[in-house]
Structures are given as C-alpha cells and as structure tokens.
Amino acid sequence: MSIKTPLQISHPLEFYEDKYRKAVAPEWDLRILNNVFDSVVESDIENMYENIFSEIWIDNFKKSYEFSKANFKRVQLYLTTPILYFSAELTWLFSAQVVPNDEIISDKFWKKIFAFPEMVLSSKRSKPFMKLQNIIFDENLLDNYRKYLFWDDDLFYKVYDIETIGHEFGHTLWLDIDTQSIMNSKTWVFKNIEEFKATTGWLVAYFMGKNDDDLLSESVIRDHVIRTIWLLSYKKVNEIEPYYCEALIHLSILNESWIISLDNNKISLNFSNYDNLKRI
C-alpha cells in the first residue's frame, strides 16, 4: 500500500470464489500508470457526502462521519493498465477495484483505487453485437449506446469517471470501522447492500452536482440502465449475489421513475423522465 511509483503491485483481489468463507481467489498483477484522462469525480463524491451529513446533523453520527471522511481523504487513485498478471480464474479482469476491502487494515494502510479505463473501452469495443441485446433493448437505445461507445472516447471516459471510479469512491463512505464485521457476524449480508450503496453514491453525487450537459447525463443513465439489466444475469451465481441484489433495487427505482419502459417487449429509455429519477 505504501508503493506510489508508476508501477503498482496488486494484492489478492475481491473475486468471490468461495461462497461459504467469502474467500478470494489468488489474483496478482503488475500495473503501470496510464493517465488517459484526469479524474474529477472525487470532489463531487465528497461534496455529496458533506451535504447529506449536514442535513442529518453530523454530530448525530460523528464517529462514522469522521472515520469515513478520513478514509476518503487518504485514498490513492491510479489509472493503470495491467502488464503482468497471475490468476486462478481470468473471469473479472478488469473494471476497477478499491483495495483493501478490510476497514481495520485500511485504517492503518489507507486505500487505493485502481481503474483501467483504456482496457475497459478496448474490451467493450471488441465484443460482438449479440442477438440477445436486440431482444432485450429497443433499437434506439442500442444505436445511441453504440455511437457513444465507438465514436466518442472523451465521452466514454467522462462516464467511466462518474460511474466506475465514482462507484469505488462510494465504497469508502458511510462506514464505521466495524460495520462489515458486525453485519457479517449476524447475516453475511454486508456485500448484498454494499454494492448498491456504492453505485447509489455516485448517482446521488451526480444528481447533486451542477451538471447541465444533457448528452453526458443521458449517456450516464443509458449506461447505468444497461449495466443494471446485465447484472440480473447473476441471479443463480451465489458467489457474486451482491451484484444481483444491487440490480434488483436499481431496476425497481428505474421502473418507478418511468425512465425505462417496456415497449413491444423491449426496454426503452425515456430520458424525458430524468427529473423523476433524480427526485426518487
């Protein structure tokens, strides 16, 4: 955790290989800095956190507020590209990670966020267009998503910063030092709500920010909708159940806001209901 050079070494990462002990597979790699853009999402996340705590009175939750804020301020962000890696299963590489996922260790050694924007963009572009996508989503939604994905690197990186890096920053907040251990000692449901919390963090931060770029907002929500539907595929994968739980909650919110609808048995995006989503 103390290494701050352009070459970064990962630790065993958060891949849910053992559903009983919540153990992780051995995943090691060497990463090199690749700053393809300047991340700006950190300030939005911090402003959201401060504003919400000011509304609910910081003094009522002072210990939790100060612990999370201290963790947040000590996060190191690295935009990188993996150059060497060893893994038990190459099934989740790479989107982004915040490490370590233990608050006691983090209290001593801080946290790092690793992001892989260029690799993620390249990976998404290399995937074939699937018939299943055309069965699930309407043509207009897919066409606009593919234009954004293939024709506008800068827009993609802005969305990646807001969603993916914002998600990882969201993991560092709304925690006390023993939150995870207490929840898991009783029900093992910490991760089942933690992924939803992290995604909701960047959503609320974006909604509370001064964002008047409709193209960016529509791209952000479209990507969020597609990701939510995709996460439903984890229904029967017990090791990564938290992402399915997250998807169910977000799908309920998307439906309630009417920002998505089912037209001719296909999901369409109704961006005109964006304000409904923000209110909910």
Residue ranges and their predicted role:
Residues N140-R146, I177-I182, V225-W230, S257-I260:
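Short acidic (Asp/Glu) and glycine-rich catalytic loops that position anionic groups and cofactors
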Residues Y157, L203-I280:
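Long, well-structured alpha-helical subdomains associated
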